[in-house]
Swiss-Prot record:
Lineage: Eukaryota, Metazoa, Chordata, Craniata, Vertebrata
Residues holding K(+) 1: 143
Gene label: KCNJ12
Chain sites annotated for binding K(+) 4: 145-146
Main location per the UniProt record: membrane
Location(s), subcellular: Membrane
One Pfam family named in its UniProt record: IRK
Protein name: ATP-sensitive inward rectifier potassium channel 12
Family membership noted in the UniProt record: Belongs to the inward rectifier-type potassium channel (TC 1.A.2.1) family. KCNJ12 subfamily.
UniProt topological domain (Extracellular) ranges: 105-129, 147-155
Catalysis performed (reactions): K(+)(in) = K(+)(out)
Renumbered ranges of motif PDZ-binding: 425-427
Keyword Lyase: no
Binding positions (K(+) 2): 143-144
Subunit organization: Homotetramer. Forms heteromer with KCNJ4. Association, via its PDZ-recognition domain, with LIN7A, LIN7B, LIN7C, DLG1, CASK and APBA1 plays a key role in its localization and trafficking.
Amino acid sequence: MTASGRTNPYSIVSSEEDGLHLVTMSGANGFGNGKVHTRRRCRNRFVKKNGQCNIEFANMDEKSQRYLADMFTTCVDIRWRYMLLIFSLAFLASWLLFGVIFWVIAVAHGDLEPAEAHGRTPCVLQVHGFMAAFLFSIETQTTIGYGLRCVTEECPVAVFMVVAQSIVGCIIDSFMIGAIMAKMARPKKRAQTLLFSHNAVVALRDGKLCLMWRVGNLRKSHIVEAHVRAQLIKPRVTEEGEYIPLDQIDIDVGFDKGLDRIFLVSPITILHEIDEASPLFGISRQDLETDDFEIVVILEGMVEATAMTTQARSSYLANEILWGHRFEPVLFEEKNQYKIDYSHFHKTYEVPSTPRCSAKDLVENKFLLPSTNSFCYENELAFLSRDEEDEVDGEQDSLGPQARRDFDRPQAGTALEQRPYRRESEI
């Protein structure tokens, strides 16, 4: 039978909603009772899908004073419109303040009276009212220097105020430029181009049940020293009866073996082996459908352009973990390079041979593992690819040199989905 005549027993799950409608059914190894298990109501997320923490601070003592004491961090953290409004008000307040001071000096010196009445040299030339004093304040702080108004040696106080306003203007400018540059250079936005899969999966990997999720980098610039970590968050009651609403338990992603450090050039599947030390060791597929927990995944590294540390976060609720699924391949070899097809990044396919028991029961040999030579989705892709390559080679051999060149030309423009792919493990 040819590759095109084979039936594909693996169903593709392309969205989060499809994964939530999966039912437990009897697999090839006899696990499962065929009943539909209803999930409990979804708990509130501690970390949202976009990485934001779902928390709100309340009843904080001296919140305003504490935020004002760290004014620079406050200006960097607030929204752009508020930061620009603050600096605009700061400039306007300084201009008004020194404008009022110069106006008071002029009033005290009698500069607002006609020059013929007193015959003295004014403290500030061409200042005959508050508006003129305000314009002189703006010219002094911004160093515009139109030339109509200037300070004379008649009033040392006016000279001192010009020096003071120049210093205040430099301080405001430096603070504003520093805050804007720090806000623009923050690595927070770099996390927007770091991608996590919509779902996590549980499947066999080298004979062991593993929790897996996928991460990817949408930019060609690298994340230096990239490493991942994960935590399981769920409510817990201690032996003394204390209720902990968000108990955090570390999930090992290969720290001892160095597997937590990744070279994030192409999408990588992060793996957590469900062993005796795993908090998921006693959870089966049926338990997963009714359990209440959240897995927070974190990707950290340095931005290549700025060497600043960035952090991307996401989370998976229990109903977002697909038992008995694997991720579709996204990395394919094409001519002299590798191509990444992000249209398959979030897609998974079901593997019915995955045991439905917990890893604990699997270790205790209560259930038999399926054959390691069982047919899988990647194998089918590889067979289809080889069959198509053989057909193409056969057609090319039957053509002449000129016809062979004509045959190769449209193949270079074939869409990515139509080109022969190799299995992910062969690349």
